[in-house]
C-alpha cells in the first residue's frame, strides 16, 4: 500500500512511525510523464509479498511543496530511501530496475 503524504508533519510522522523499516518515497507530479509511467510500478511493488516490511510513501511536489522543499527535490520522479529517519540513498528517473535494486539492497 502506498501512503500519500500531504504535508511535512505527515512526512515526519511517517518516517518516525516506520522505525527501522525501509521507507521508500516517490516524489512525483501529475504533469510529469515519467512519473505517470513509474507510478503504477511503485504501487505494484508496495503490494508485493517481498516488500511487506517496506513502507511506501508518495509525495506530490505540488500538493506537498513543504516536503519537496525540505527534501530539496529538483526533478521528478525522485526516490528517497530512509531508515531510522535518516536518508540512506536516492536516485532520480523512472527506472524500474534501479528502483527494485535499491529496495532490495536496503530492505
From Swiss-Prot:
Record's GO cellular component terms: cytoplasm; extracellular region; nucleus
Post-translational modification: May be nitrosylated on several cysteine residues, depending on the oxidation state. Nitrosylated Cys-75 may serve as donor for nitrosylation of target proteins.
SUPFAM superfamilies named among the record's database cross-references: Thioredoxin-like
Sites of S-nitrosocysteine modification: 71, 75
Subcellular compartments: Nucleus; Cytoplasm; Secreted
Predominant cellular place of this UniProt entry's protein: nucleus
GO molecular function: protein-disulfide reductase activity
The Thioredoxin domain, residue ranges: 2-107
Protein name listed in UniProt: Thioredoxin
Gene for this chain: txn
Amino acid at each position: 500500500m502506498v501512503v500519500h503524504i500531504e504535508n511535512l508533519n505527515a512526512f515526519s510522522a511517517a518516517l518516525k512511525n516506520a522505525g527501522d523499516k525501509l521507507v521508500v518515497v516517490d516524489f512525483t507530479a501529475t504533469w510529469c510523464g515519467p512519473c505517470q509511467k513509474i507510478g503504477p510500478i511503485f504501487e505494484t511493488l508496495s503490494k508485493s509479498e517481498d516488500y511487506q516490511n517496506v513502507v511506501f510513501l508518495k509525495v506530490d511536489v505540488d500538493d506537498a511543496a513543504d516536503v519537496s522543499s525540505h527534501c530539496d527535490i529538483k526533478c521528478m520522479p525522485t526516490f528517497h530511501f530512509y531508515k531510522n529517519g535518516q536518508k540512506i540513498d536516492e536516485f532520480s528517473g523512472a527506472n524500474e530496475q534501479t528502483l527494485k535494486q535499491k529496495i532490495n539492497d536496503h530492505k
